[in-house]
Design a protein with these regions (language model features):
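Short secondary-structure boundary/capping segments
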Residues: 4-5, 53, 123, 130, ...
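Flexible, glycine/small-residue-enriched loop-and-beta-strand segment within the central core
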Residues: 67-151
Length: 172
């Protein structure tokens, strides 16, 4: 089983030395380098680069630079999506963001995690669990969304939150 297959199954995998995963992250870094250096007025170029990088991009998508992610292809964003500056998505697993989602500055969405056992962690092993963010969600500044979390529809995540468990729809 390849490291990528292990990752997709939620198993521990080696993301540090696997050539396939390294090449895919390198591709994302190259696209992000270009994206993060575009002029503010270059809307068409930004959209084109997002469509090349991300797995799915709805209509009316704005991600303010700088933006960083691991692979890009695991990220799907719906219609009318806005993310302010310094969004970081560690997308070892799928990240699905619904329609009308708004993300404030300095938010981290992390599918990646590491073993609590130091010996395994020191081997460079990690896991990735998918994250789902529903429709009509607002995530406040400096919030962190951790692996495996589902955020329902019509949710507001307050600034500075660390989301470690599922949040039901219509919650604050």
């Amino acid at each position: 089983m390849t490291e990528k297959e292990k990752c997709r199954q939620g198993l521990l995998y080696d993301a540090n030395y696997d050539r396939e995963l390294l090449a895919e992250r390198e591709r994302a870094k190259e696209l992000l380098y270009d994206y993060n250096r575009l002029r503010p007025s270059q809307y068409t170029e930004k959209t084109d680069l997002l469509r090349s990088l991300l797995g799915k991009v709805g209509k009316q998508v704005i991600i303010e630079p700088p933006f960083n992610c691991d692979y890009g292809y695991n990220i799907e964003v719906g219609e009318n999506f806005y993310a302010n500056v310094n969004l970081v998505i560690l997308d070892g697993a799928k990240v699905t963001i619904g329609d009308n989602a708004f993300i404030a500055p300095n938010v981290g969405i992390y599918t990646a995690g590491h073993p609590l056992d130091a010996e395994r962690r020191n081997q460079g092993l990690e896991y990735a669990y998918p994250i789902r963010i529903g429709n009509n969600v607002w995530i406040g500044a400096h919030s962190v969304i951790l692996p495996g979390v589902t955020i329902g529809d019509h949710v507001v995540i307050g600034a500075g939150s660390v989301v470690t468990k599922d949040i039901p729809s219509y919650s604050l």
